[in-house]
């Protein structure tokens, strides 16, 4: 058995320092004079323990961390996309993560998203509170450990930093994590470690690397044990064209050994298994050799995990990023079953009605589904690959069920030409983005605006609560129809509504409303108009000074009360309550009250049951 280096991924919001941190880690180790230096892999950088020791100084000893690991293996591509693409059975390929954030800005949308992804994958992580050099008054010392750098700051600057750290602590607490600045942590097993750093100046980098090693020793002892002579297992990072080589597969190996001429199996975008034979294994040349030979790669016969390698092999056009890769020299059927079970292992709880989800890799599909689930968004289907005509048709079927589910959420995939043609003939929505958070936010914002549109449409189709007052000395005609000057006391009144008095008696129907010779279809509170009331007789059905109410059915009342009340003005709500009192006194004491006697449901047939609701 051999102990491999922990695989580390860096996540965080855009422009919060992910790439700068990785560049600085690489840069400081390249500049190191220690023997060995860094090892550059395909898609990754391995920093050996002797280099880490030279950076961390006495911190490893102070934290009682033994130098038993070979080093740290950093995934070069930062962010959610790489993290979710690099997955294996049971979670992320990354053993550890750095959640980086701008200490001057705190949590941002993608920070929350990264935290949710780490939470769902159960990946141990350290928080890097970056850009301490941007705190007003901070006195930077390049490459200094934080513990010394903070001693060189004015007390007001230290206070300012503490305030920002505790804002992060508070937000993490709200998200279900207890945390503290690394030098104040009382229990490393139960608290997330926050390390203030500057990815630009390198301040705090010694403590950050030390905390990562501490996490590795605490959580990963068994996980890092690998069999050197076992057939390799890995994850496809990317399939890409290389000049002079054709299509190649960039892969991260996390277990076993990979040999030239091995037969390997992977998954395609259609979730089928392909088998191919390795023609070449390539690793990056050292930087000085690249400068001399002008070629970036060198052949090797064998690669041992953990490692990043470029594989040259035929028939890999349809291999999907994020696919597991396994050596299958002897037991093809077993390996094929294992690969197919990887797809089944992404447990997607689908619904009869819901949205369609498309993504480019198994990992990104899993991450997207997890976030949609956390927001209670139902999913009809979730698949890898570009949006097809069939997807558009299926989404249009969902649209017929409910407009808000006639939607495709697509992460980092394209719309096929045949699907574009079909899309032009349908009412469905397609949301495309390379940021999962943005996709979910765009969809939820669209749903909310659609709900608002539906509410406005419904509000326009129902009878709104309103009351009027017959103005004294302004009755112009006594009957057929009665015409009087009225003041609108609340709400909006429309032509065609029925008026009742405070005893619940029907007065008549509004036939027309006029102001300065202009016919008005509806008028609102504060208006004074001449109103023609059909079937009403002055002094029989109403008198000067009477207050009349717009009548409505109980169904109309429930529709407003249950769905549209937030769209009414206060005066309309009061009028509706007055109308309910009138109805309860004159018609039914339970008018407008939801019946909570569930026993009567047992006697209803299906149609009556629907009417009940």
From Swiss-Prot:
CC per GO annotation: cytoplasm
Region (G4): 130-133
Claim: Nucleotidyltransferase is one of the keywords in the record: no
Region annotation G5: where it falls in the sequence: 198-200
Record-annotated tr-type G domain positions: 3-220
Top-level taxonomic group: Archaea
G1 as annotated region, ranges: 12-19
Database matches in Gene3D superfamilies: P-loop containing nucleotide triphosphate hydrolases, Translation factors, Translation initiation factor IF- 2, domain 3
Keywords: GTP-binding, Initiation factor, Nucleotide-binding, Protein biosynthesis
Binding residues for GTP: 12-19, 76-80, 130-133
Region (G3): 76-79
InterPro entries reported for this sequence: EFTU-type, P-loop_NTPase, Small_GTP-bd, T_Tr_GTP-bd_dom, TF_aIF-2_arc, TIF_IF2, TIF_IF2_dom3, TIF_IF2_dom3_sf
MF terms in GO: GTP binding; GTPase activity; translation initiation factor activity
Region feature (G2): 37-41
Similarity field: Belongs to the TRAFAC class translation factor GTPase superfamily. Classic translation factor GTPase family. IF-2 subfamily.
Alphabetized NCBIfam families for the sequence: aIF-2, PRK04004.1, small_GTP
PANTHER family: EUKARYOTIC TRANSLATION INITIATION FACTOR 5B, TRANSLATION INITIATION FACTOR IF-2-RELATED
Biological role stated in the UniProt entry: Function in general translation initiation by promoting the binding of the formylmethionine-tRNA to ribosomes. Seems to function along with eIF-2.
Name listed for the protein in its UniProt record: Probable translation initiation factor IF-2
Provenance organism: Methanosphaera stadtmanae (strain ATCC 43021 / DSM 3091 / JCM 11832 / MCB-3)
